[in-house]
């Protein structure tokens, strides 16, 4: 005797399909997508942390004008980059590496959208040990940033770099002319000083920039474009720039860049 199924046939078929591993809701594909989203969110969190660390470094080194970056140099900076916690390791042959953030002054004297960068460089010598240093670069013109448009610039090679002047004595000097394209500073164990980092290579952190500004965002788009707004994660750094080098203290002409 034929017994009528308790559930319609299409319901039973659907249950069979959903019971197959990897098919339907909750399968491995969905788990993979969720994992990717979580990893991306974690990475974005790292960018936010990097921007906040850079902001803190910038604010801390300006607390003591007697031993910090001259205010006149900050006011006339075309761009400022901060790389917190640059690690330098040496064991016969050493090297340095760090991740930071850079922003460029706009024609209206405000600060544009920051881009994420990386620095690396080798050092040779019979040193053993590991040191952590905060590094700041002050760009006095757009020439120092041109290499970054091609995603790479070697300091001291592609762009001139010099140890930055320190304190009010440098600012008060009658013959002080900020004629180097880039001035570099370092802070290690609480000590702050100008430091020439020749041989250091600065590149765009493409993966970080794409996460925050979109898959097609380039260094040119972020630093020299007019349509991109600063990512929310970079707000602490922009706020710090507005505090140490506020709007209205600098006049600059818009730079025309050729697209490649």
PLM feature spans:
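Bacterial N-terminal signal peptides that target proteins for export
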Residues: 2-11
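Bacterial N-terminal signal peptides
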Residues: 10-20
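Sec/Tat signal peptide C-region and signal peptidase I cleavage site
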Residues: 20-26
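Small-residue-enriched, tightly packed secondary-structure blocks
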Residues: 27-260
């Amino acid at each position: 005797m034929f017994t009528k199924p308790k559930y319609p046939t299409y319901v039973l078929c659907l249950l069979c399909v959903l019971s197959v591993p990897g098919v339907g809701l909750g399968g491995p594909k969905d788990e993979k997508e969720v994992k990717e989203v979580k990893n991306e969110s974690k990475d974005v969190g790292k960018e936010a942390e990097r921007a906040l660390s850079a902001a803190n470094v910038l604010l801390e080194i300006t607390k003591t004008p007697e031993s910090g970056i001259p205010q006149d140099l900050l006011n006339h900076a075309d761009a400022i980059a901060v790389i917190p916690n640059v690690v330098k390791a040496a064991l016969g042959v050493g090297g340095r590496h760090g991740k930071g953030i850079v922003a460029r002054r706009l024609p209206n004297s405000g600060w544009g959208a920051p881009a994420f960068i990386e620095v690396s460089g080798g050092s040779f010598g019979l040193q053993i040990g590991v040191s952590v240093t905060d590094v700041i670069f002050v760009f006095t013109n757009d020439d120092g940033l041109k290499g970054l448009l091609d995603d790479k610039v070697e300091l001291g090679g592609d762009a001139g770099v010099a140890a930055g002047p320190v304190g009010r004595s440098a600012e008060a000097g009658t013959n002080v002319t900020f004629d180097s394209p880039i001035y570099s500073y370092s802070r290690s164990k609480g000590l702050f000083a100008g430091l020439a980092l020749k041989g250091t290579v600065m590149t765009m952190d493409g993966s970080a920039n794409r996460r925050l500004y979109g898959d097609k965002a380039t260094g040119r788009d972020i630093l020299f474009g007019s349509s991109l707004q600063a990512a929310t994660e970079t707000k602490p750094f922009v706020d710090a720039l507005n505090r140490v080098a506020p709007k209205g203290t600098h006049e600059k002409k818009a730079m025309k860049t050729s697209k490649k």
